[in-house]
């Protein structure tokens, strides 16, 4: 891997996008009372983020994905994002997006910007079976995507 003098690691949900696509997509198919209950458990430390997201998605039918993608299509990208990417390219600073959300969501939203993004790391959502399955090689039991582990893959000063 290349040694970078400077590198930008950017979060996706709520940083590049104007809202969190994970939370929004969960709300599409989950009982609002259940969402509140599990959000409370997360806030009280009774469940980890990894557990809550797995619970929500792995109980959902794979057939829900098209509806989720329709929702993702409606989520905005923050103003100035393209200009930021263009400036980083001029300065020869690579931009790596690390998303704790689903690859299908981030890849879809970032498609118009791919030429400026060095790499996208995201959680995989397997929809090949009747139920969704969350796959992440960087799940540490607390987070689905332990971003510091991904950052450690890159050599930078």
Which stretches of residues belong to each language-model region?
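Active-site neighborhood of HAD-like aspartate-dependent phosphohydrolases
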Residues: 1-58
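Short, surface-exposed acidic
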Residues: 33-39, 65-68, 116-117
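Metal-dependent phosphoesterase signature
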Residues: 50-83, 91
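C-terminal cap/substrate-recognition subdomain and adjoining C-terminal extension
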Residues: 80-94, 101-157
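Conserved active-site and cofactor/substrate-binding residues in soluble primary-metabolism enzymes
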Residues: 20, 76, 146
């Amino acid at each position: 891997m290349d040694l970078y003098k400077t590198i930008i690691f950017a979060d996706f949900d709520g940083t590049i996008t104007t809202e969190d696509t994970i939370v929004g997509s969960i709300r599409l198919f989950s009982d609002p009372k259940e969402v509140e209950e599990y959000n409370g458990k997360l806030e009280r430390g009774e469940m980890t983020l990894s557990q809550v997201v797995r619970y929500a998605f792995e109980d959902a039918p794979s057939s829900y994905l098209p509806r989720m993608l329709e929702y993702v299509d409606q989520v905005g990208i923050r103003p100035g994002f393209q200009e930021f990417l263009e400036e980083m390219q001029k300065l020869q600073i690579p931009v790596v997006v690390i998303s704790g959300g689903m690859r299908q969501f981030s890849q879809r939203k970032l498609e118009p910007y791919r030429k400026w993004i060095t790499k996208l790391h995201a959680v995989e959502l397997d929809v090949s079976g009747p139920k969704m399955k969350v796959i992440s090689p960087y799940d540490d039991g607390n987070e689905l995507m332990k971003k510091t582990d991904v950052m450690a893959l890159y050599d930078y000063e």
